[in-house]
Each structure stands twice: as C-alpha cells, then as structure tokens.
C-alpha cells in the first residue's frame, strides 16, 4: 500500500522506487530495531515502521522532524513499530542496539560508520547522489571492512508527448550496502548532507 505524505520538507522525500530497493537491502523483520539518520519527510521512517519492531529516527532540524511527525500521524493505522523520533545529531543520538541502519545523507558519515562498527549493526545502507561523495563513502566502507556492494541506479518516469511516451529521468542514486558484524574502525565525515539528500530525491 502506498504511503501518504501530505506534508513536505525542502529536501523532499526519498523516491518510492529508491525506497523499494532500500527496503529490499535492509530486509527488515518484526524483531528488528531500525535506525535512521536524517528522517526529513519521514518517508523511509514510515516504510520501516510497517516492517520493523522498533524504529529510531534522527533528524537534526526541528522543522523537518515536525514534518516527519505529521506524516507519521497520517499513516498511523498502517504502522506496526514502536517509534522513537529524536531531534539529534548522529552519531551521538543513535541507539546502541540497532540491527539495521540507513544513512540518508553524508553529514558525519564516517563517525556514523564507526558507531555502526562499534555496535555491530548487521545491515547498513547509505544513499548518496554526488559521485565524489560516493567515492569517499566507498573507501570509508572498505576501510572498515563492511562493504558488501555498491549499486548505482536511475529511474525514469514516462509522460505523454505529442501522442507518444517520453521520459523524465531522476538523478542517479549510489547505494552502498554493508554490514558491521565483526568489523573495525575509521574517522570523520562530510558536512554537506543536504546536497546528497536533495539530489537523491529528485
């Protein structure tokens, strides 16, 4: 069932097709504790809360957290998880017992990965849209021995043009997938998370 997103934020929601791939990689179950860095509109938060037993979502911007809360309320009848929304930075605001982790932007991503390694997060997914950040993120995953795969994909939507069908293309998304069970450490991150999130949602 599609989710309802009546409220919006500047960066916009993660696109439905991207969410589908993301959820497939995370493979959330009823016993899982899912943690999210950068909830924004709450699109991923809502999808995860339909599948996981617990959801902890961080959003450092109060106005975006309010949008997350409003969109969660619009979908409350379909949510199964216990949800904890935190107006906090990562990694400081992250739980220590997450089974799965999603990074929706690149702010402090190396420190977040260090936390994931220290707490042995089983499934980690990070989305970025800028090539340079994707390169740095790939190296950071490799340095910590947590990289399983990098997926690059692009979605196009058809529209009618002169009685035929043409396509508008969304920006490409680079999805880094890994797991930190039994891995080692690293250091600091990139501050320009909004650029990745804004482009990945277009």
Residue ranges and their predicted role:
Residues 41-52:
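Conserved SAM-binding loop of SAM-dependent methyltransferases across substrates and taxa
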Residues 117, 121-174:
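C-terminal substrate-binding/active-site "lid" region of AdoMet-derived donor-dependent transferases
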Residues 108-116:
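A short, conserved alpha-helix within the catalytic core of class I
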């Amino acid at each position: 069932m599609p989710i309802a997103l009546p409220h919006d934020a500047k960066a916009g929601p993660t696109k439905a097709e991207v969410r589908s791939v993301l959820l497939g990689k995370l493979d959330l179950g009823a016993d899982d504790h899912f943690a999210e860095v950068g909830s924004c509109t709450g699109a991923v938060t809502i999808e995860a809360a339909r599948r996981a037993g617990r959801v902890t979502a961080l959003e450092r911007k109060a106005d975006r957290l309010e949008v997350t809360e409003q969109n969660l309320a619009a979908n409350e009848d379909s949510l199964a998880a216990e949800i904890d929304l935190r107006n906090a930075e990562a990694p400081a605001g992250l739980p220590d017992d997450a089974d799965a982790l999603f990074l929706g932007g690149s702010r402090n991503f190396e420190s977040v990965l260090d936390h994931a390694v220290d707490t042995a997060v089983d499934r980690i997914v990070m989305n970025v849209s800028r090539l340079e950040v994707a390169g740095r993120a790939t190296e950071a995953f490799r340095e910590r021995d947590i990289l399983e795969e990098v997926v690059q994909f692009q979605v196009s939507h058809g529209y009618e043009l002169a009685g035929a069908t043409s396509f508008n293309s969304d920006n490409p998304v680079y999805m880094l997938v890994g797991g930190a069970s039994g891995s080692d450490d690293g250091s600091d991150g990139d501050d320009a998370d909004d650029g990745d999130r804004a482009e990945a949602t277009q």
